[in-house]
Each structure stands twice: as C-alpha cells, then as structure tokens.
C-alpha cells in the first residue's frame, strides 16, 4: 500500500459510542499501517489503565506547561479534565513509517480540522465520525461502564446530542450498530483513502 506519512486519521464521536473498542480492533489490522497516537489527560486513571499505554496521565500543572510550550496538536477541557495529543507523538509515529490514528473527542477533532483547513492541508486528514444507532443505545453503553454517576451520564448524553450536530465536519460518518460491520467499513475507508495519497 502506498502511504503518505504526513497523513493523520481522526476517529471521533460521542463518549460511549465505542471509539476505544473500534480503535483496538483497527490496530490489530497490520495491513493498515496505523499506530495509535496516545493522548495526554489530567483525568483520574481508571483501574485497568496504564500510563503511556492508554494515556499519558499528567497533572494539571504539567498539562498547562505543555500548552504554554505549544506541545499539543490539539487539546480541550471536558468535565474539568484536560485532554490533548502531543505533537511529539505524531512525529514519533510518522518517523516509524506509520500513519497516526487519533481517537479523540469532537472538540479536539474540530480544532485539528479547522487548523488544517486554515493551512490549506485538509487533504492530509482522514476524518471519521462514529455515530450511535440512537441516544438510548448510547445511554445504555455508558451505564454499562459503571464509571459515571447518573448526573455525569446525563451530562454526557446532552454533550453527545450537541456533538452529533457537527458530524458533517467529518469526511465519513459510520454508525456503530454492529461492531464487526462498523470496523470492516472503517477498514475499507482507511485502505481506500490512504491509497489516494
């Protein structure tokens, strides 16, 4: 497969839509030549997460210093926690001849899309928005995680409704109704789009 290493793949969508599961399945497909750009965050580490594998867990002070030093390709703050993608992660992945996959929230994705558009480099982005089959199914997925209170779940659902409204900023939209079909559709999109570069 012909690959342009300056390309970025952005996978985004509401919290609870299955981005993490989809991402892990995509990464198993070695033919795609993608590697996950690990995000940095200030949120509390979940019991099954590992620093440097799932996220780079930073203090608020460390995160703010990196913002000041322009070390992020994108960053945002949600539910009192900072999230961002370090430029060094992107460069590291590209130096290994892989395409960085960013699994990020819609605010971060929107910031990157606007930044690339302003620089006339939108063609370097492959943007994919993952949709839930319905808001009710999204609510069920979030509840099954057992990590949020009812208030937090309702906040996430309200945020999801707003995020879905910007889905057309993304080149592709895929509904995660059936996980295997969703992943297969995204694999086809990535293979086809990367060959165009």
Curated annotation (Swiss-Prot):
It is found in: Cytoplasm. InterPro entries: GK/Ca_channel_bsu, Guanylate_kin-like_dom, Guanylate_kinase, Guanylate_kinase_CS, P-loop_NTPase. It is an enzyme of class 2 (transferase). It catalyses: GMP + ATP = GDP + ADP. Its EC number is 2.7.4.8. Keywords: ATP-binding, Cytoplasm, Kinase, Nucleotide-binding, Transferase. It comes from the Bacteria. Disulfide bonds: none annotated. Residues 6-191 form the Guanylate kinase-like domain. Essential for recycling GMP and indirectly, cGMP. This is Guanylate kinase. It comes from Mesomycoplasma hyopneumoniae (strain J / ATCC 25934 / NCTC 10110).
């Amino acid at each position: 497969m012909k690959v342009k290493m300056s390309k970025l793949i952005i996978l985004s969508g509401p919290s609870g839509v299955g981005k993490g599961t989809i991402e892990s399945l995509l990464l198993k497909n070695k033919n795609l030549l993608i590697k996950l750009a690990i995000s940095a965050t200030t949120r509390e580490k979940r019991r099954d997460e590992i620093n440097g594998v799932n996220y780079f867990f930073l203090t608020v002070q460390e995160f703010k210093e990196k913002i000041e030093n322009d070390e992020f390709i994108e960053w945002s703050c949600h539910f009192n926690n900072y999230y961002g993608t370090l430029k060094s992660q992107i460069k590291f992945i590209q130096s290994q001849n892989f395409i960085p996959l960013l699994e990020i929230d819609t605010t971060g994705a929107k910031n990157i899309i606007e930044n690339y558009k302003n620089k006339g480099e939108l063609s370097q982005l492959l943007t994919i928005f993952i949709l839930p089959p319905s808001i009710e199914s999204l609510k069920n997925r979030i509840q099954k995680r057992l990590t949020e209170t009812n208030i937090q779940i309702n906040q996430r659902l309200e945020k999801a409704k707003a995020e879905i409204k910007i889905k057309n900023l993304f080149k592709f939209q895929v509904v995660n109704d059936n996980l295997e079909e969703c992943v297969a559709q995204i694999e086809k999109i990535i293979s086809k789009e990367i060959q165009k570069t």
